A protein has these predicted regions:
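Charge-rich, low-complexity N-terminal segments
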Residues: 1-134
Length: 134
C-alpha cells in the first residue's frame, strides 16, 4: 500500500508531428493548452503528514513556465513532441530535477479534455534514476 498525491499544471504551446500522412491535421502546426499531472507516492507519510510538500513541485512549474509555455515545442525539445514523448520527457525531468525524496510514479499529459498520454514508473524506468529521455 502507498499514499499517492498529484498536482496539475498547464502550459500553452504549439507543435506539429512529422512523418504523418499527407493532410493529417497533426502534421500542420497547431496548439494545445496542455495539462500536466504529476503523481508522487510513498509507503509512509513524513513528520508533517505529507507524501511530499506540494512546494516540492515548484521547479516543474518553473520549467514549464519558462521553457515550454508559449513556445513551439519542435524548436525547444530534441524529439518528436507527441503527447507520449512529452509525458516521458517530463517524467525523466522530474526524476532528475526534483528533490531526491520525491518519488515520481507517473506523469500524465493531456492535449485536450478527451486525449492524454501517461508515462509511469515501471520495471524498466526505475524509481531513483531518470528514464531515458529522447
Amino acid at each position: 500500500m502507498a499514499f499517492v498525491i498529484g498536482r496539475r499544471f498547464s502550459f500553452a504551446a504549439a507543435h506539429h508531428l512529422a512523418g504523418l500522412p499527407a493532410g493529417h491535421k497533426c502534421s500542420r502546426t497547431h496548439g494545445h493548452t496542455y495539462e500536466v499531472e504529476v503523481q508522487l507516492a510513498s509507503p509512509a507519510l513524513d513528520a508533517a503528514g505529507f507524501v511530499a510538500d506540494y512546494q516540492t513541485l515548484e521547479p516543474l512549474r518553473h520549467y514549464l513556465d519558462c521553457d515550454l509555455d508559449h513556445r513551439d515545442l519542435n524548436e525547444v525539445l530534441p524529439f518528436q513532441p507527441s503527447c507520449e514523448n512529452i509525458a516521458r520527457h517530463l517524467f525523466g525531468w522530474c526524476q532528475g530535477n526534483l528533490p531526491s525524496g520525491a518519488l515520481v510514479t507517473a506523469v500524465r499529459v493531456s492535449e485536450s479534455p478527451q486525449s492524454w498520454a501517461e508515462y509511469h514508473a515501471g520495471p524498466n524506468t526505475g524509481a531513483s534514476r531518470p528514464a531515458v529521455t529522447p
